[in-house]
Amino acid sequence: MAITAAQVKELRDRTGAGMMDCKKALTETDGDIELAIDSMRKSGAAKAAKKAGNIAAEGTILIKNGEGYAALLEVNCQTDFVAKDANFLAFANAVLEVAAASKVTIEDLKAQFEETRIALVTKIGENINVRRVEYIDGANLASYRHGERIGVVVAGEADEETLKHVAMHVAASKPEFVNPEDVPADLVERERALQIEIAMNEGKPAEIAEKMVFGRMKKFTGEISLTGQAYIMEPKKTVGAILKEKGATVSNFVRLEVGEGIAKKEEDFAAEVAAQIAATKA
């Protein structure tokens, strides 16, 4: 049977798929829109499965406050171009709304939005991944987003401006812990053992080596903790000193950055071109 423009439009409106894909599905199902939708869903799932192996290390970090807490969400795609796409961002924001409403786990978020994700993968042509969601509790919360790629929420007892500035510091300086004493004992001991070995290899006497290690360990725990770091807005003071001056405290923070921990494929374009030239000469 002949497929009409009205049928194609209806299928496009309901699925968001391209015109040619809609026409193809309608032709294969003799104009039955419901069967065409089922066919496209099956086809989309197959396409999404193929795309699943593609590295998705671009994307966005989103933040939204709930009642006494905030949600931070990372959704990934393959390219920074798609990371700015309106359909991709609408999907990410829809996931965030559900997460922020009731602290939904990442597993439940993935399951709830899997069908929508598959449809988006089919439409956009890239692997899309709802990667992680983090929640932070607190009566006083301040958030900061650096572009689309970094999101920070800080919880503490301080005025809004102070917490906001601390959130900006966290975005820039990447602390791992709030205070030096929060650094896990096993991490401290591993670093201490390494520093002792380094000092001994330098030929230092044991007593001097011990003093050197003490100083290095203080520096180590300070550099990876928020309150021990030099404050980006007043580098001669630590964040801890600034907070003390203001009678403020920070109890927790969460920092997410797009793609952190994802191994990206390194592209060697020179080698690729050389290989293509060699192939043409073969």
From Swiss-Prot:
Any one of the GO CC terms: cytoplasm
Major place of residence: cytoplasm
UniProt-listed InterPro entries: EF-Ts_dimer_sf, Transl_elong_EFTs/EF1B, Transl_elong_EFTs/EF1B_dimer, Transl_elong_Ts_CS, UBA-like_sf
Localization annotation: Cytoplasm
Involved in Mg(2+) ion dislocation from EF-Tu: annotated span: 79-82
GO molecular function annotation: translation elongation factor activity
Gene3D superfamilies: 1.10.286.20, DNA helicase RuvA subunit, C-terminal domain, Elongation factor Ts, dimerisation domain
Keywords: Cytoplasm, Elongation factor, Protein biosynthesis
Domain of life according to the entry: Bacteria
Keyword Protein biosynthesis: yes
Pfam families named among the record's database cross-references: EF_TS
Family statement: Belongs to the EF-Ts family.
Function: Associates with the EF-Tu.GDP complex and induces the exchange of GDP to GTP. It remains bound to the aminoacyl-tRNA.EF-Tu.GTP complex up to the GTP hydrolysis stage on the ribosome.
Entry protein name: Elongation factor Ts
